[in-house]
Structures are given as structure tokens and as C-alpha cells.
């Protein structure tokens, strides 16, 4: 019985989302940033979105938008997990606003459905941005960043 209770306790701890706060000291691109949290520097990959790569159409615009919104600002990150590169993957909040969602709403990022299937609000915002031709959706044929990365990996 104790083993079962202990297992349930450990499992429930793993389900609790970790939150970190800090100041954004660098925006690498439209979905990655560097956070100064106390004495630690933490690389954060924004959950559920995929922004154009910097060498891709609209990549610099996406980065610039994110910089204007959160660079040198104090934010909160609800950490979902850690990726294979050691980055914290999470939802970024500035003044309680979901910046990940905002990046999709404004056409600055794609909804990364593969990693965030349950994010119905993200899916809805993605479709709305496409219909309104906002941001990267002004292009007639925008390329999914994932496909761009795959194509350019072959050329290296």
C-alpha cells in the first residue's frame, strides 16, 4: 500500500508545471529566447509555436516582433518540458498575456500542432491569422519552418 501511495505521490509531482520568472536578455528568433532568472541564464523554446527561421521569409520580422514585445522585460514561463537541446519548452507570459498565442494571432508564427495538439485556442488563432492574411500569411505560399529546416539540412 505504501509503495502505491508513494508512486501516486511521485507521479502527481511530475504533473505539476514548473514556472520560472526572469528578464529576457536576448531573443534568438521568433520562438527562442534567453532568460536571466536570478544568477541563471535559461534558454527557452516557446511551446506550441514554430516561427520562421531567420534565413526564411518573414524570419527577421518575427524575431523583431518578439523583441519589441518582451526584450528587457520581466516575464513568466510555464515550463512544459525540456527538449533534446536542453532548452526549457514553455508558455511565455508577459503581464499575464500568453505571448505564444499572440505570436500565432499576429501571423508571426505557425501553430506547432505536432507538439501541442490540445491547444484549441492556438489552432483557432492560427486559422484566423491565415484567413485575415496577417504577418507571414501575406505571402501567397509561406513555407512551414519545419519543411524549411529539413530542406536546408540536406544542403549542409
Model-assigned labels for residue ranges:
Residues 2-156:
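Small beta-barrel nucleic-acid-binding modules, primarily SNase/OB-fold domains
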Amino acid at each position: 500500500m505504501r509503495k502505491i501511495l508513494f508512486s501516486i505521490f511521485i507521479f502527481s509531482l511530475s504533473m505539476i508545471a514548473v514556472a520560472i520568472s526572469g528578464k529576457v536578455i536576448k531573443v534568438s528568433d521568433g520562438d527562442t529566447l534567453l532568460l536571466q532568472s536570478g544568477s541563471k541564464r535559461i534558454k527557452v523554446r516557446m511551446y506550441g509555436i514554430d516561427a520562421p527561421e531567420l534565413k526564411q521569409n518573414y524570419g527577421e520580422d518575427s524575431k523583431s516582433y518578439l523583441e519589441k514585445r518582451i526584450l528587457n522585460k520581466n516575464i513568466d514561463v510555464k515550463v512544459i518540458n525540456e527538449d533534446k537541446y536542453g532548452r526549457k519548452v514553455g508558455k511565455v507570459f508577459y503581464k499575464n498575456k500568453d505571448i505564444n498565442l499572440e505570436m500565432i494571432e499576429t501571423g508571426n508564427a505557425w501553430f506547432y500542432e505536432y507538439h501541442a495538439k490540445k491547444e484549441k485556442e492556438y489552432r483557432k488563432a492560427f486559422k484566423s491569422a491565415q484567413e485575415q492574411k496577417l504577418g507571414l500569411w501575406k505571402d501567397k505560399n509561406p513555407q512551414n519552418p519545419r519543411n524549411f529546416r529539413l530542406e536546408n539540412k540536406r544542403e549542409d
